[in-house]
Amino acid sequence: MEERNKTLGEFIIENQQSFQYSSGELSRIINSIRLAAKVVNYKVNKAGLVDIVGAAGEQNIQGEDQQKLDVYANEIFIQTLINREIVCGIASEENDDFITVAGSDNSHNNKYVVLMDPLDGSSNIDVNVSVGTIFSVFRRITPVGTPVTIEDFLQPGINQVAAGYVIYGTSTMLVYTTGDGVNGFTLNPAIGTFYLSHPNMKYSKDGHIYSMNEGNYVHFPQGVKNYIKYCQSEEGDRPYTSRYIGSLVSDFHRNMIKGGIYIYPTSSKAPKGKLRLLYECSPMAFIAEQAGGKASDGYNRIMEIQPTELHQRVPFFCGSYNMVEKAEEFMKNTK
């Protein structure tokens, strides 16, 4: 079978033995995310026609207004994972605490926890900008047969066994890694099937795009300001092109395909950064590294940061390897 005619289901079956633990459970988790993503995609595509755009009148744990689609997507992903009884715990951007999944027999026998941002960039729905889902999978560290604890979730990114994202754009794509490269699958909406469309995705070592909210320039640390000036200077192959959508998944996806760097630094308004380590930065860092890129907080490898809380925030520099290296150089020289 030609690679590009291969479905996601066929790809998972063929590559199951390359998974770190050769587990059917992990394959079922990816399949569950695929199913939930198709349901969410249907709602996203109808967002302008029904009453599911705009704010729901509540705030999540971060104090951010919850969009109606945020709430819907969160429920769909959680219920899909719970109903299939394949995980022992779930953590979401939209929930204050983690969810313990005991299973119908109350055995707590499953081995994996899933962390997710069910609908990244959902504030853009009203203006028809691409949004996405981000997910991360860890093997639990507490004994099987016992309820999960916070320690099962507070693991460094290097412990991830799978990570990925779904981008709901002009086409819907699911991109994921299990530590053996990155592959992208595009949904054929006519038959509801994901097909392998982007095998072995790779960052270029160098890129020509930088992505950040330059409207916050005055609030950025000096190292970031210096890097922006470097990107804009007319030397060598510069100036670089500035492209910023405001949806992490969308900006990351474009930069991985075209070559570039995404930066969400600390600022005087957000001294710890804005993005969450466990269900935004760590999974994207895993994907980036598997695609030959690099991810950092400006000084340290994202994948090696030991989380201390579920909704911990960190600054995020991610993209083409040499671009992130250069940004780190500016940060360290002005520390």
From Swiss-Prot:
The keyword Hydrolase applies. It comes from Flavobacterium psychrophilum (strain ATCC 49511 / DSM 21280 / CIP 103535 / JIP02/86). Belongs to the FBPase class 1 family. The keyword Metal-binding applies. Mg(2+) 1 binds at E93, D117, L119. Pathway: Carbohydrate biosynthesis; gluconeogenesis. Homotetramer. Its main location: cytoplasm. This is Fructose-1,6-bisphosphatase class 1. Gene3D superfamilies: 3.40.190.80, Fructose-1,6-Bisphosphatase, subunit A, domain 1. It holds the Pfam family FBPase. One of its GO terms (molecular function) is magnesium ion binding.
